[in-house]
Amino acid sequence: MNAAERYFQAVTGILQTVMTQEQDALSRAADLLIEKLKEDRVIHVFGTGGHSIMGAMEMFQRAGGLYPINGIFPPGISVTDSHPNTERLVGYAARILDHYGVRSGDVLLLINVNGINAVTIDAAIEAKQRGALVIGVTSREFSEGVPPETPARHPGKLNLCDLADIVIDCHVPPGDAIVDIPGVTHKVASASTFPVVLIVNSLLALTVERMAQQGLEPLVRGSANLPGGRERSLKIQERYRGRVVHQY
């Protein structure tokens, strides 16, 4: 097999592992989201790293998603406006959760593949101290493969997988890249975006399915690029003004 074929094989293997081993976690997470949506709460979603943020973006303001999703996108976290040290800044997460209105009784979906940086760990700790519940999308294998003294780690040497109330494991190996090329020192082609996107969309699908089975009408977002889509969105979004920070 060439490198592209080996990459495809490795990625599909990870996806199969997620769907085989994470059904219980997905089920419990979906039930928790339904509970909070019944209480008319928004679901806070925070990707706490330069690429993990894409998992939160996948759930936010996108056709097929839910309207009451409060995407958390603070300055300095995405690869377009970040400094490598921003996600390692102790104390930043508390101010972020203040700004985005994470409160007692809420649920925070935290997405970070390595699960070790300061913003990730502080966000989990701070949310729980406020009385919120935390769903973590992360790789236990990656977290446990990072030595305690690695500079990227939170000073407390903690892992997201040990703090979250529900952990959905994305099963990404340490280092993220998965293809060996003869003669090249480092592996190439990162894997993590695929299982993270699979997890968040599977969680959305399961949540909506169960709501419908319970006779509830989930507020699913249609495409703004189809006739009437934008007009419908503007109407529904009024319900969440002030609670979904980045509505447009």
Predicted regions and their residues:
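Generic N-terminal amphipathic, Lys/Arg-enriched alpha-helix
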Residues: 1-20
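Flexible, glycine/charged-enriched surface loops at secondary-structure junctions
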Residues: 21, 25-28, 43-45, 212-221
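A short, well-structured juxtamembrane/interface segment
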Residues: 21-38, 96
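Long amphipathic N-terminal alpha/beta scaffold segment
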Residues: 34-40, 49-53
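Glycine-rich phosphate-binding loops that contact phosphosugars or nucleotide phosphates
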Residues: 45-204
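Internal, active-site/partner-interface "lid" segment
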Residues: 149, 176-180, 184-187, 209-234
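Acidic, Ser/Thr-rich low-complexity intrinsically disordered segments
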Residues: 227-248
